[in-house]
Amino acid sequence: MSRFSQQYGGVVLKGLVLIALVASVAAYRILPPIDDPSLQGPETVLVSQVRTMPASGGNRVYWGDLHIHTSLSSDAFTMGVRAVPDDVYRFAKGQTIRHGAGYPVTISRPLDFAAVTDHAEYLGQARLSGLDVPTTRQRLGDLLADENRLTVTQSWWEIMSLIRDNGFKLTLEGVDSAINRSAWQEIVAAAEQHYEPGVFTTFPGWEWSADAGDVGTHLHRNVIYGSSDLPGIPFSSIDGETPPELWTFLRSEREKGRRVMAIPHNPNLSEGLAYRVASETGERIDRLSPEDRSDLEPISEILQIKGSSETHPLLSSLDEFADFEIAGTVPGREMTLTSVKGGYARDALRSGISMAHNEGFNPLKFGVIGSSDSHNATSPSDEKGYTGKLPMMD
């Protein structure tokens, strides 16, 4: 049975409407007056009795996290993470696991669903190589406090050299496909082991981590599957580095009968590219029909550790809360109206509605979710029990 259509106590969760804030409204039925002479006095006001009826069907709200990394992500491993996919699901279910910094962590309230979304690029390579790098031996605060300002830079160069020396090679099939496949099998096995229909749902998936031009201009998507019928290896940005190439892959997966979708995240770091539908010359950048984009990417992740992607003060000048949890700037760049337009959900939805009126189609129809992007194998959504993003930063 598809994970995208599961039975939860008689209520069907259709699609991934994960945070649909739908209230169950009680139905009321007015009953006839009670035939009781004692209630018919001159000073008595007769009020029809109201009885509540249980709501039938409808939607329920379920809580989960569709963006969690483990030591299979090379950036997580080189920052001190040693947790595995099994730890993600144990933590999400309420069990205690060990944080990368060495202390035990437990979620305050178990989740209903979760997904391990390790980076498809270099999947499992750093862990297999057992890289011993500065960022796994020393906390970032200590590195930054070092009197020698070159320490951090030297640390990063040491990481890059070790990655190169340990055979992180690019091929047309991806990065060392044998290692990739093995790591992917570990992710799938953990999802199958912890999947409890009607109790706890796991979603196999990965993160497609493409950057436009330079690192820091994010076009990242999480690819989420709703069934156990899966490809043998993740599709990474090495296999296809543009969103249209990813969409073509997703469409081919759909044609094989696999239920899959992509969730864009951190559009706030995309330099306005995340929700752009045409180039500066007006040419459409997606080669699919307008309906395909909203079908393949029905939701966007607009809140996580790297800031809010709902709106920006430059786009919503009259909204006094528009600066809530804004990430600030893309590293090394100043945020301008040009760089933020196309990078925030509220403006994108408005653009989609405008396109529907003016051009007769809307490729920007989507719902919204919040996720963590934790690289600690945890879901740090509780302020009092915040487990951070990476051990070297926590």
Give, region by region, the residue ranges found by the protein language model:
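Generic intrinsically disordered, low-complexity segments enriched for polar/acidic and small residues
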Residues: M1, S5, V25, N59-R60
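N-terminal Sec-pathway targeting helices
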Residues: S2-L18
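Extended, charged catalytic domains and RNA/DNA-binding interfaces, predominantly
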Residues: G10, A27-D394
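Hydrophobic alpha-helical membrane-insertion segments, chiefly the h-region
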Residues: I19-R29
